[in-house]
Structure formats: C-alpha cells, structure tokens
C-alpha cells in the first residue's frame, strides 16, 4: 500500500517517513521528469518541521485533509490554484535532498570540522568527529553506498598532521594531558584504518588525481580503473602486486582474515580450524599447489595455536595434524620441481603472491617442515608426560611413537633433497631433524631399531646420502653422529650425538666401544659449564656405561662409575626423571617439560641393585682382609664404611626375618659370602626378580656366579689364613667349584699384589702361609693383644686421675721411656718387612693414583634444577 493512502497524513508523519525512505523510492523521486509533480512533491516533502510554521500554514492556507487530499485544487499548486498562494509558496519552498546526499553532506561537514581543529591541536574534537565519521561510514555500507574516495584523502591528511605533531612534540611538549591522550588514541585508530585500506592509501600516494575526480564515488570505481591499468601495464610488477592484493581470491581472503586475527584475544580458534578444514575440503581437487600449500601451513599452525594454553594437544587434533603433515609432504614431493617449502625461502609482502622462481625454476616458499615435525613430536612427549605410565592409555599413546618416527625419516629425506650439497653441513633445519631422529632410536635395542628403520623406509621414494636405505643399525647410529659432528653452525648437535652413541653402545652390550667413545670425547673436563639438557644426557650415558660395565663383568669399573651418582641423593634430578628436593607441584612448567617420558627412564631400583652388588663383590673380601689385619688402615674408605654400616645395622636387629626387599637380599648374601658360602649368596642374589630387566639375563647370572666363586675364595683365604698353615688347592677347588688353573691363578694374583704376604704355592697342590715373616697369630691371640693394649691405656688413665695429673711424674716418665724403647724394637722388627714391601707399596700407590684419575673421569654432571632455566653450576 502506498504511503500516500494513509489517513491523517501530516507534516510530522512526512518528516518521519523522510528518514525511512528506501533506496528505490529515492531513485523514483529523483528520476521523475514531470515538473508539476516535482514541484508538488517538493512542496510536500520540503515542509519544515518547525511547529510555528506548520500552525501558520494550516491557519492561512486551510490545508485540506482527507483520503484524497492530494487531488484537491488547493493542494495542486500551479495547476489552476491561486497565484498569490503560489508565489508565497515559491518563496518558502526548500530543496529536497536524498538520504545519500544528506549523508555525504554530513560526512563532508565532519571533515571540515576535523580540518579546522587539527591545526589548532584540538585533538579531542578531532577524535570525536572522527568517531562520528566512522558511524557515517557504517551507514554508507548498510545502504550499499560504499566508502567514498574522500575518506582516503582524510586518512592521508590526518596521518600527515599526526606525523608533524609527533615531530614537534619530541622537542616541545605543548599538548595538554587530555589532548595528548586523544592524540594518541587517534593515532592508533588512523594507523589501523590505513592498514585496512592500505592498497588505496598507497594508490592515493602514487596518483592523487584519481581521487580528486568524482570524490563522492565509492572506492570500487578506483579499483575498476586500477584493474584496467594493470591489464595495459603488465610489466609493472609493483602495480601488479597491488592489483593481486586488491582482488583476493576466496581462499586467500579467508587465509588473510585468519592470519590477521592470530594472537588477538577472544578469537574462537576451533571455529578457525573448522573454516580451514572446509576450505581445504572444497578446494583440494581444483586449487593450485601454491594455494594448497598455503592452506596446509595455516591449518597446521592454527591447530598448534589452539592447544598452546593446554597441557598437551588433544589426541584428535594431533592425529589430524599428523595426517595433514603427511598430505603436505605428498603434495611437496609431487611438485618438487616447481614448489619447495624451506627455511631458506623468502617471504612476500602479501599472502597471495608467489615467490620468484630461482635459477632452476623452483619457487621456494618460506616455511619449515622440520619445525612442524618438532612441534608434533613435542606434543606427543607432553602427552606422555601427563599420562599415567602404568595405565593402558600410556601404552596406546606410545604406539604413535613409531608413526612420528616414520614422519621424521620422511621429513629428513625431503629436507635433504631440497638442501644444496654445498650448504648441507650449514643447514640448521637438516641438523635439527637428524638430531630428532637420533633421539628416537638411541635408547632402543638393535632389534627394535631395525624394525623401525624397515617400516620407515617402506614408502619413501628418496634415498639419503647421510644414511642410505638398508644400512645396519650400527651404521645408522655412526653415520647420523658423524653428520652432526660436522655441523659448522651449532657444535651442540655433535655433542648430543656423541652422548647418544655412547648410550646406544652401552645399552647394546658393547662396553669397550662405549668406554672408548666416552674417554675420547673428554666431556668430563667441562661438562659442568654445559647446558642442562646436555648435562642430563651426559649423566644418562654415564649411568648406562656403568650398567654395561657390570654386565661385561668389569665390577670395579662399574662401581667407580656408579658410586657418586647413586650416593648423591639427587639421582632423579641428575637423570631428568623427577625431583628429589621438591614436591611435584612445586616444579615449574619449564622444569617439568625438561623431564623425560617414562619409557625412557633408567630404573633406579635396578641401578641401586647393581651398585650394591658391585659393593658386595668388592668390599666383602676387603672387610675380611681388614678384619684379619687390623694394622692395615690403608684399605679403609668411605664406601667401606657405608656398606659395613648396613651389615652392622642388620647384626643389631633382635629378630631378622627372611629377605623381602632388594636390600635385604643383598645384605643376606653378603653375610653368607663372609662365611664362604658362595652358593647361598648366589641363590639369594639370583632370586631378585629385577635382573630380568636386562635382555641377557642368563649371561648376567652366569657372570655373577663366577664372580661370587672368585670373591668367595678370596674372602675364605683372608679369613682363615691366620688359622691354617697350609690349604689344599684341591679342597678349595671342591668348595668353590672352580677349576684347578683358576684357583691357582687367583692365589698367585693375591700373592703378587701383596694381599697374602709371604704365601707360597707348593707344586700347585698346596698354598703355604708359613713362609711369611708376619707373626702367625690366631684370632684369640689377636684379641688378647688388643685387650692388653686397652688395659694398659686404662691403667695409665686411672693413675693420672688418682694423682690429679701431678703425682708420679717420674714414674710416668719412666713408663714413657719404656714404651719408647718397645716402639723402637717393634720398628726394627718391622724394618725388614717394610723393605720387602716397598716395591709393592710403590706399585700400589701408582695404581691408586691411576684409579683416582680414572674415577675423576666418571664424575657426574651437577644439574641445578632450582630455577626455571635448569642451569648448571660449576
């Protein structure tokens, strides 16, 4: 129904409807060619809203009303009406403007106010008018008028004024506080608007005349003109770049919108992920490789950003990223001759501009396959760290480890294929992914590494010059390590690689090679000044070297290597497996992230069990030797005291039940070995179930049995050499189930090293203790001598107490002289013995010096975890 057919139409209603005119109605009013209708419409729509004018007009003219009032003669002025009335109406007639013209006039008025106040530094008024102008722009967009060209001129003018004012304010502070705040706010808003209209802003700078013509027209007219110019001037690369940025395809428009919103607050990242997934699904078969590569890179980054505030990436998102990363590699491998993604690529100013092709015709897009794989692997590690290691979820999640390893090998092959040969040893991205590959295999046994390698190379077309397809496991480790050692930029990669190699050879029962690598690397000289991750890896390699020495039968070396780290009370921290000095909730996020996942941990119970077993085999014979030669104090050391304290604590117990823990088994085995019962000791040690964690369990138990037989024989000799004059070698052979040659060899070694001084083997049948120059005393005689010495000391003390320290001074002096004479006689008796043992002692001292030097080589790295950076202390 037309608005004219409304009863009771008044000037008030007409003024209200004037603001509600639609665009189509405005065009109809402006396109009418009939002068009379125009005049009558103008007189009608031009009625003033002022109430005084309305009342006077109604009283004098007698304005008609009713349903057909516009047909009445008095309404149709100039069509037979009164001339006097017509003349008076012509004088008061106003020009009717459309909503478009009125809006443009309001915008120009705001521009005039802005221009007049910006020169006076009235920035509060300028800011208010600019905000008002922004509301006008919103109305322009709502009515499909578009943004006028003079808005770009306004932005340019304000930007120049702001720059000039900023330069003046550096020298003289003339702005008041409120004006300065308004100025800073306006400056930020102008910058934001310029970024939004950057293309038109740059075009205005180059060609301002284009914006002076028909400045009321929308910016789209400038765009159309620019596109025509670009077609005519295809050689102009700058204008071509502007045109490509200006007319973005739907794909790049979506990517640009998401890229600009990254890092901002209150952004629904899951919605962005869904948008990119739909975009990829819709264009996967019809888009160019450059567009697909851009979508994949943006999608991977947004997924990682979505989980940045979480403890770890959700499994569903992780699996999608892994699949999309594989699809991206498929795309890159299919277009390797035209497109490459590398950290060596150059960035472009606009998201939709492809990089310039190099001499080989390949366009290198800036990106990093290595960083994406690293981030994906880190998210898997964080997921394992936050999962109960004893649950089935951990086992299921650990299955993804083989998936990520396949992706790492594939990524290494691709990065290696696009890296020039002359920069291969300078490439950071290639070194990082090679190190990541080594991190995934160094702690595994050979059989598992071989299976992983075969599966990883199954679907890879490229071959590798670093590690060729089909190489043995040892060759894989050696060649990866050799490549990282040749890196010229970051020497830390080579250090990590050597420690990984030491760990690998130690785990796989190649102790001699692991030891050679460790001593040749000389990490022990400056490890305390290294970074924390390197220190942790050093401690892990050192511990694994000690375990490998134990499995190889090098008991003393294993004891030296493990001694300090087991007794440090900080073994968890030193190995990157937890915290001893703080509760888990006190650890920072960075400290927890540096911890290793559970499946890479070294079993601390196994470590302690190995160390205590080594202590048993070394210190039980030593304790027996000391107990039967109380004058030899050179054998005493801290480790003996610690182990002896465990035995003394056990002896003080009123009731001791059967062994339950690992420590109980070892203590009971020690007591049995002290008595020479090596078989009982072996049965107790072999019943410990933790030995099954070693892959070569049977060989290990056989080695332990042989060591217990040998140390049992030595303990037996030390204990009973003062009781027997001769011992039958055949009897010793039967007791300890050793061959005759082995028994003779052990006894000869004991005599040579001075453990059994003066002993002699007669016809390989007996060992005689009578040729020694030491007095052969029984145990009772030795105890009687000790008791006599203590009684003498007690008597002297009582005599001093009785005389209050002053009486019988002469008697005490005589006693002292007598004691001095006795000591001189004893010294003369021992002089011959000391001369005989001089060479042995010098040799022993040199051996001790060498052992101390070698022990210093096996000192652990002191990792300090008291701060977030996990720094080392020297």
Curated annotation (Swiss-Prot):
Residues 813-848 have a biased composition (Low complexity). GO terms for biological process: formation of cytoplasmic translation initiation complex; translational initiation. Keywords: Cytoplasm, Initiation factor, Protein biosynthesis. The keyword Protein biosynthesis applies. Pfam families: eIF-3c_N, PCI. The keyword Nucleus does not apply. GO terms for molecular function: RNA binding; translation initiation factor activity; translation initiation factor binding. Residues 862-874 have a biased composition (Polar residues). Its main location: cytoplasm. It comes from the Eukaryota. It is found in: Cytoplasm. Residues 1-70, 797-874 are annotated as: Disordered. One of its GO terms (cellular component) is eukaryotic 43S preinitiation complex. Residues 14-61 have a biased composition (Acidic residues). Residues 598-774 form the PCI domain. Component of the eukaryotic translation initiation factor 3 (eIF-3) complex, which is involved in protein synthesis of a specialized repertoire of mRNAs and, together with other initiation factors, stimulates binding of mRNA and methionyl-tRNAi to the 40S ribosome. The eIF-3 complex specifically targets and initiates translation of a subset of mRNAs involved in cell proliferation. Component of the eukaryotic translation initiation factor 3 (eIF-3) complex. Belongs to the eIF-3 subunit C family. HAMAP family: eIF3c. This is Eukaryotic translation initiation factor 3 subunit C. It comes from Candida albicans (strain SC5314 / ATCC MYA-2876) (Yeast). The lineage of its organism: Eukaryota, Fungi, Dikarya, Ascomycota, Saccharomycotina.
């Amino acid at each position: 129904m037309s608005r004219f057919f409304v009863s009771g139409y008044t000037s008030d209603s007409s003024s209200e409807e004037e603001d509600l005119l639609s665009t189509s109605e405005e065009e109809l009013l402006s396109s009418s060619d009939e002068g009379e209708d125009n005049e009558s419409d103008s007189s009608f729509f031009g009625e003033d809203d002022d109430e005084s004018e309305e009342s006077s007009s109604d009283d004098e003219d007698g304005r008609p009303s009713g349903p057909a009032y516009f047909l009445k003669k008095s309404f149709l002025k100039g069509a037979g009406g009164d001339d006097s009335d017509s003349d008076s109406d012509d004088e008061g007639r106003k020009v009717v403007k459309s909503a478009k013209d009125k809006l443009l006039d309001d915008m120009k008025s705001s521009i005039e106010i802005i221009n007049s106040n910006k020169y006076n530094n009235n920035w509060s008024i300028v800011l208010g008018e600019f905000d008002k102008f922004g509301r006008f722009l919103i109305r322009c967009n709502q009515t499909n008028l578009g943004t006028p060209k003079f808005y770009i001129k306004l932005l340019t003018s304000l930007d120049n004024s702001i720059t000039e004012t900023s330069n003046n304010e550096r020298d003289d502070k003339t702005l008041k506080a409120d004006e300065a705040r308004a100025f800073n706010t306006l400056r930020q808003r102008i910058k934001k608007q310029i970024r939004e209209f950057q293309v038109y802003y740059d075009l205005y700078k180059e060609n301002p005349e284009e914006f002076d013509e028909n400045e009321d027209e929308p910016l789209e007219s400038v765009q159309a003109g620019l596109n025509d110019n670009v077609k005519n001037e295809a050689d102009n690369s700058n204008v071509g770049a502007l045109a490509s940025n200006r007319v973005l395809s739907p794909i790049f428009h979506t990517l640009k919108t998401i890229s600009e919103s990254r890092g901002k607050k209150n952004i629904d990242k899951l919605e962005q992920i869904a948008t990119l997934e739909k975009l990829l699904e819709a264009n996967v078969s019809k888009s160019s490789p450059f567009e697909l590569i851009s979508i994949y890179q943006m999608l991977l980054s947004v997924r990682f950003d979505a989980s940045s505030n979480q403890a770890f990436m959700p499994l569903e998102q992780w699996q999608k990223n892994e699949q999309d990363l594989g699809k991206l590699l498929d795309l890159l491998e299919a277009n390797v001759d035209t497109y490459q993604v590398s950290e060596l690529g150059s960035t472009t100013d606009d998201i939709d501009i492809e990089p310039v092709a190099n001499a080989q015709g390949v366009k290198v897009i800036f990106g990093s396959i290595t960083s994406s794989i690293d981030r994906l692997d880190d998210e898997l590690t964080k997921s394992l760290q936050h999962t109960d290691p004893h649950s089935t979820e951990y086992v299921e999640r650990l299955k993804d480890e083989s998936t990520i390893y396949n992706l790492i090998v594939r990524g290494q092959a691709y990065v290696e294929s696009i890296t020039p040969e002359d920069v291969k040893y300078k490439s950071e991205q290639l070194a990082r992914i090679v190190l990541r590959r080594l991190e995934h295999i160094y702690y595994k046994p050979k059989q598992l590494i071989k299976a992983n390698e075969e599966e990883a190379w199954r679907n890879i077309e490229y071959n590798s010059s670093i590690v060729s397809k089909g190489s043995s496991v040892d060759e894989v480790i050696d060649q990866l390590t050799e490549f990282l050692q040749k890196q010229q930029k970051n020497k830390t990669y080579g250090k990590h690689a050597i420690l990984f190699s030491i760990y690998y050879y130690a785990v796989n029962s190649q102790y001699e090679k692991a030891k050679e690598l460790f001593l040749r690397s000389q990490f022990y000289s400056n490890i305390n000044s290294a970074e924390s991750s390197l220190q942790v890896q050093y401690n892990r390699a050192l511990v694994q070297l000690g375990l490998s020495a134990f499995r190889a039968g090098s008991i003393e070396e294993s004891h030296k290597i493990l001694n300090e780290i087991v007794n440090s009370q900080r073994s968890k921290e030193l190995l990157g497996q937890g915290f001893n000095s703080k509760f888990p909730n006190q650890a920072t996020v960075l400290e927890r992230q540096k911890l290793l996942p559970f499946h890479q941990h070294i079993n601390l119970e196994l470590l302690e069990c190995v160390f205590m077993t080594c202590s048993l085999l070394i210190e039980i014979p030593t304790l027996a030797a000391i107990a039967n030669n109380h004058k030899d104090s050179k054998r005493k050391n801290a480790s003996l005291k610690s182990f002896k304290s465990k035995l003394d604590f056990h002896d003080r117990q009123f009731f001791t039940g059967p062994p339950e823990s690992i420590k109980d088994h070892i203590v009971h085995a020690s007591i049995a070995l002290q008595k020479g019962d090596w078989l009982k000791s072996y049965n107790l040690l072999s019943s410990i179930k933790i030995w099954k964690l070693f892959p070569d369990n049977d060989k290990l138990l056989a080695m332990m049995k042989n060591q217990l037989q040998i140390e049992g024989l030595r303990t037996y000799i030390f204990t009973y050499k003062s009781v027997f004059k001769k011992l039958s070698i055949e009897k010793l052979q039967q007791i300890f189930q050793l061959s005759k040659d082995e028994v003779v060899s052990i006894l000869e070694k004991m005599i040579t090293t001075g453990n059994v001084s003066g002993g002699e083997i007669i016809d390989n049948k007996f060992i005689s203790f009578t040729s020694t120059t030491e007095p052969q005393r029984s145990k009772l005689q030795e105890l009687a001598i000790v008791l006599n010495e203590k009684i003498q000391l007690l008597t002297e003390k009582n005599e001093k107490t009785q005389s209050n320290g002053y009486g019988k001074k002469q008697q005490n002096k005589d006693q002292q002289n007598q004691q001095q004479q006795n000591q001189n006689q004893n010294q003369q008796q021992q002089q011959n013995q000391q001369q005989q043992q001089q060479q042995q002692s010098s040799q022993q001292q040199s051996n001790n010096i060498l052992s101390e030097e070698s022990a210093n080589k096996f000192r652990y790295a002191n990792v300090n975890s008291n701060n977030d950076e996990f720094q080392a202390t020297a």
